[in-house]
Curated annotation (Swiss-Prot):
Keywords: Antiviral defense, DNA-directed RNA polymerase, Immunity, Innate immunity, Nucleus, Transcription. One of its GO terms (cellular component) is RNA polymerase III complex. It comes from Bos taurus (Bovine). SUPFAM superfamilies: N-terminal, heterodimerisation domain of RBP7 (RpoE), Nucleic acid-binding proteins. GO terms for molecular function: DNA binding; DNA-directed RNA polymerase activity. Component of the RNA polymerase III complex consisting of 17 subunits: a ten-subunit horseshoe-shaped catalytic core composed of POLR3A/RPC1, POLR3B/RPC2, POLR1C/RPAC1, POLR1D/RPAC2, POLR3K/RPC10, POLR2E/RPABC1, POLR2F/RPABC2, POLR2H/RPABC3, POLR2K/RPABC4 and POLR2L/RPABC5; a mobile stalk composed of two subunits POLR3H/RPC8 and CRCP/RPC9, protruding from the core and functioning primarily in transcription initiation; and additional subunits homologous to general transcription factors of the RNA polymerase II machinery, POLR3C/RPC3-POLR3F/RPC6-POLR3G/RPC7 heterotrimer required for transcription initiation and POLR3D/RPC4-POLR3E/RPC5 heterodimer involved in both transcription initiation and termination. The gene is POLR3H. GO terms for biological process: defense response to virus; innate immune response; transcription initiation at RNA polymerase III promoter. Residues 166-175 have a biased composition (Low complexity). InterPro entries: NA-bd_OB-fold, RNA_pol_III_Rbc25, RNA_pol_Rpb7-like_N_sf, RNAP_E/RPC8, Rpb7-like, Rpb7-like_N. PANTHER family: DNA-DIRECTED RNA POLYMERASE II, III, DNA-DIRECTED RNA POLYMERASE III SUBUNIT RPC8. This is DNA-directed RNA polymerase III subunit RPC8. The keyword Nucleus applies.
């Protein structure tokens, strides 16, 4: 679920931090810049793990701050495909079941990846597994807040870097706002034995 990613960045330390240990200042600046940010095709940055190398620091004319090239390793949330995770149901919609891990919310289990047969209850706004028994179908509701075990089957990165509007977009910008896309999305599946709500598979 978590991986260590080697990175290199130039860190600017302002003069009023010179009295502190350099590593402490760099640690703070890197976490301020990267923590809780999604890096394209890398994952969600969590926190600094360690600093592996510090190159020479430079002070440029007109800027009293020091600039240091830093080699470091960062803890990144990037689960591998087919990994099994446990989260909580954040909500349900016709698009599927939305799951949260607490620190990461952009997880979707689409209808075709639910335990089948499944239906969406419009009145309750929840997905229901119509579990077949000898006594007939038994509805198992996927309620908000329930813990769910799922398999990661796909991921999607979207480059959300700001870009200048095109002429066509500029003309329509006053009419409608573009839909905000999540920079990193996971697609899950619970369509196999043992997956789904933990309460479904609790041994009696």
């Amino acid at each position: 679920m978590f991986v260590l990613v080697e990175m290199v960045d130039t860190v600017r330390i302002p003069p009023w931090q010179f009295e502190r240990k350099l590593n402490d200042s760099i640690d703070e600046e890197l976490n301020k810049k990267l923590a809780n940010k999604v890096m394209y095709n890398v994952g969600l940055c969590i926190c600094l793990f360690d600093i592996t190398k510090l190159e020479d620091a430079y002070v440029f004319p007109g800027d009293g701050a020091s600039h240091t090239k830093v080699h470091f390793r960062y803890v990144v949330f990037h689960p591998f495909l087919d990994e099994i995770l446990i989260g909580k149901i954040k909500g349900c919609s016709p698009e599927g079941v939305h799951v949260s891990l607490g620190f990461f919310d952009d997880i979707l289990i689409p209808p075709e990846s639910l335990q089948q047969p499944a239906k969406f209850d419009e009145a309750e706004q929840v997905w229901v597994w119509e579990y077949e028994t000898e006594e007939g179908a038994h509805d198992l509701y996927m309620d908000i807040g329930e813990e769910v075990r799922f398999r990661v089957v796909d991921e999607s990165f979207v480059d959300t870097s700001p870009t200048g509007p095109s002429s066509a977009e500029a003309a329509s910008s006053s009419e409608e706002l573009p839909k905000k896309e999540a920079p990193y999305t996971l697609m899950g599946s619970i369509s196999e034995p043992g997956l789904g709500l933990l309460s479904w598979w609790t041994s009696s």
